[in-house]
């Protein structure tokens, strides 16, 4: 094979490089987002339950925004949407995990969160 010269194009080299990187476990950056799993346990510094609700209330009131308030039962009865019913199949779609979503329990109970993250949940 003397005298054989291999010529590689840029596209070929990029393909080979990406293939090697993916095979050794290097993954593209996905940002700071991480979803919670049903099997996750609360973080030791996470805040959960009524303590989390109180903390959000405090964070929202300390940022000059109106605090979260519990709804009144009478107000719930006046809700024009209260008589709308969904089929079981349709209702279950709301319970399945949606890709790319997170919530306050995931952000502040399953792991510790910042004041800035808490304030994102102010009404």
UniProtKB/Swiss-Prot annotation:
Residues 1-31 form the signal peptide. Expressed in the cerebral light-green cells which are giant neuroendocrines cells involved in the control of growth. Belongs to the insulin family. PANTHER family: INSULIN-LIKE PEPTIDE 1-RELATED, INSULIN-LIKE PEPTIDE 2-RELATED. The keyword Oxidoreductase does not apply. Residues 68-69 form a propeptide. It is found in: Cytoplasmic vesicle, Secretory vesicle. This is Molluscan insulin-related peptide 1. SMART domains: IlGF. It holds the Pfam family Insulin. Keywords: Cleavage on pair of basic residues, Cytoplasmic vesicle, Disulfide bond, Pyrrolidone carboxylic acid, Signal. GO terms for cellular component: extracellular region; transport vesicle. Transmembrane segments: none annotated. One of its GO terms (molecular function) is hormone activity. Its main location: cytoplasm. Heterodimer of a B chain and an A chain linked by two disulfide bonds. It comes from the Eukaryota. The modification Pyrrolidone carboxylic acid is found at residues 32, 99. InterPro entries: Insulin-like, Insulin-like_sf, Insulin-rel_pep, Insulin_CS, Insulin_family. The keyword Lipoprotein does not apply.
């Amino acid at each position: 094979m003397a005298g054989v010269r291999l010529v590689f194009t840029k596209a070929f080299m990029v393909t080979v490089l990406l293939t090697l990187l993916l095979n050794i476990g290097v993954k593209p950056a996905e940002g700071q987002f991480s979803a919670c799993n049903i099997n996750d346990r609360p973080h030791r510094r996470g805040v959960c339950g009524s303590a989390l609700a109180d903390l959000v209330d405090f964070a929202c009131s300390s940022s000059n925004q109106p605090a979260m308030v519990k709804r009144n039962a009478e107000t719930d009865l006046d809700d024009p949407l209260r008589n709308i019913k969904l089929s079981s199949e349709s209702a279950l779609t709301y319970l399945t995990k949606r890709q790319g979503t997170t919530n306050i329990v995931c952000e502040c109970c399953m792991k510790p969160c910042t004041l800035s993250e808490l304030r994102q949940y102010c009404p």
